[in-house]
């Protein structure tokens, strides 16, 4: 439980040298002058060589949550791993009725997972794949903040780490997560002044676009939109940039009209004002709102203190301008765009868009904070908040690990290769789904009959009617997860894992019968 506290103390030591100030510095060069004097690749090589020990140490620290439990508890991750196992069975000819498709997007993490599994096995591949995803997201955000401010955001690393382990990570949306991280790297290269005149650097940024698309299309949309906005904004005097924000808002509104007229759309259930970037830190319960509030207080005080201290410094506010404008536009998108978009007659939707967008908002807040002159109290305050956040996260993921161990014990009581359904509902105050712990524990033991990926028609594992391993109707899968799926004779034999008393973490297993609802005996507080 105290691992993360020691890690934060180490982070404090790493950041003391040559980055801490306690009094206003002499007037800085303008951000435009600094950008014009910088070439990305040589500057990056010099930076990495100079700070390689620090970079390695910080990388090791931010990966601690990937290794502090037996399993990484991150929503859809269990489903990703389970379907990687199904892919192995299909390749070996052991899963008739299932096939492997080759979608062009939303698949990069799955390819990474399967490729590593062939070398290291599934469980080790899971750790390596998630660790790589975290490093891509964290250092991508770090690079983007550096590009926006021409200053390495060492003192913001606790905040970046919290965002890296925020809602998007805990939901297990790793294809989207990697797409964002790669897009941050590309945008850092394309930031005005950093790659001007260097065709090689432009080529690197452009070459990332296909890789980002294979990860998730939203990453490409964000990258192109942000790069275009930044390029135009850099050519417009600051006093006119408010009109550019208005134009961007109009484009978002037109996109909303297009989506609503051509697709089936849904709105977010929660009030939209809650999705302000801080929601990325609200995970398994209301106590995370303490972390959100502390971060909000820090942001207000830190920016106010910086503005007051630098009020006589000509043009200091320009470093704030474009990151703040991008944040405002991202929040306009949160308010205007639908939460879910589905093609008519297609079973699965691109869902939770509102919540996903706040990952961008959170990183853009970090970019805004990067414009401040760094002061040692920034690191002290953020390290303290991060200690609270990661303590909560350790405790909650430890609880889910214990639930998963209970699932493992339950499925071991079954004959091999049985169909298993599960209805495990999260508490109302939690924003993170947990039902996919059953998927992971079925690997090599049973078949998670209600896993949503084969029936969705958008992932690489596809189920054909009459197969023994997976449901084929997406609506049936949704009903099963809610516990009101009526069992058919052809679904049997099958077993239900369910919450069996008022303690939502206590699980039981039982055989199912034809014509009964799968979660008939479930108890949900």
Where are these regions (language model features)?
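Transmembrane catalytic cores of multi-pass membrane glycosyltransferases
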Residues: 67-80, 93, 101, 105-106, ...
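Short hydrophobic/aromatic helix or loop-helix immediately within or flanking a transmembrane segment
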Residues: 82-86, 99-122
């Amino acid at each position: 439980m105290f691992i993360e506290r020691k890690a934060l103390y180490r982070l404090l030591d790493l950041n003391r040298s040559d980055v801490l100030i306690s009094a206003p510095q002499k007037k800085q060069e303008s951000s435009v002058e600094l950008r014009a004097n910088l070439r990305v690749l040589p500057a990056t090589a010099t930076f990495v060589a100079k700070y390689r020990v620090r970079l390695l140490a910080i990388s090791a620290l931010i990966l601690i949550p990937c290794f502090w439990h037996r399993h990484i508890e991150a929503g859809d991750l269990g489903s990703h791993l389970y379907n990687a196992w199904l892919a192995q069975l299909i390749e070996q000819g052991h899963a008739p009725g299932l096939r492997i498709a080759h979608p062009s997007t939303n698949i990069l993490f799955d390819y990474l997972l399967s490729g590593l599994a062939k070398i290291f096995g599934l469980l080790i591949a899971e750790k390596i794949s998630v660790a790589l995803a975290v490093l891509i997201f964290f250092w991508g955000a770090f690079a983007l903040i550096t590009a926006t401010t021409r200053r390495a955001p060492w003192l913001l690393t606790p905040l970046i780490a919290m965002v890296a382990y925020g809602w998007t990570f805990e939901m297990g949306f790793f294809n989207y997560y990697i797409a964002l991280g790669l897009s941050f790297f590309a945008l850092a290269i394309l930031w005005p002044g950093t790659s001007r005149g260097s065709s090689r650097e432009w080529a690197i940024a452009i070459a990332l676009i296909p890789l980002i698309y294979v990860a998730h299309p939203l990453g490409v949309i964000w990258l192109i939109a942000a790069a275009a906005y930044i390029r135009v904004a850099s050519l417009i005097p600051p006093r006119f940039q408010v009109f550019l924000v208005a134009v961007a808002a109009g484009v978002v509104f037109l996109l909303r009209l297009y989506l609503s007229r051509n697709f089936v759309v849904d709105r977010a259930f929660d009030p939209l004002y809650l999705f302000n970037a801080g929601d990325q830190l609200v995970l398994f319960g209301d106590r995370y709102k303490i972390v959100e509030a502390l971060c909000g207080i820090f942001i207000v005080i830190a920016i106010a203190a910086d503005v007051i201290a630098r009020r006589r410094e000509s043009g200091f506010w320009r470093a704030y301008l474009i990151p703040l404008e991008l944040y405002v536009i991202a929040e306009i998108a949160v308010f205007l765009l639908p939460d879910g978009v589905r093609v008519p007659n297609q079973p699965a939707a691109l869902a939770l868009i509102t919540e996903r967008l706040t990952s961008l908002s959170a990183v853009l807040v970090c970019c805004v904070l990067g414009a401040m002159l760094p002061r040692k109290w920034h690191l002290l305050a953020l390290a303290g908040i991060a200690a609270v956040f990661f303590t909560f996260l350790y405790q909650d993921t430890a609880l889910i690990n214990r639930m998963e161990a209970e699932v493992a014990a339950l499925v071991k009581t079954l004959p091999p290769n049985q169909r298993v359904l599960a209805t495990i509902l999260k508490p109302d105050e939690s924003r993170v789904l947990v039902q996919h712990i059953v998927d992971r524990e079925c690997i090599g033991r049973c078949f998670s009959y209600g896993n949503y990926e084969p029936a969705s028609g958008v992932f690489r594992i596809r189920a054909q009617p009459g197969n023994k391993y997976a449901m084929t109707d997406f609506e049936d899968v949704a009903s099963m997860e809610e516990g009101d799926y009526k069992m058919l004779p052809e679904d049997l034999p099958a077993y239900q894992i369910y919450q069996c008393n008022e303690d939502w973490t206590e699980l039981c297993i039982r055989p199912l019968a034809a014509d009964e609802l799968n979660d008939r005996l479930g108890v949900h507080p």
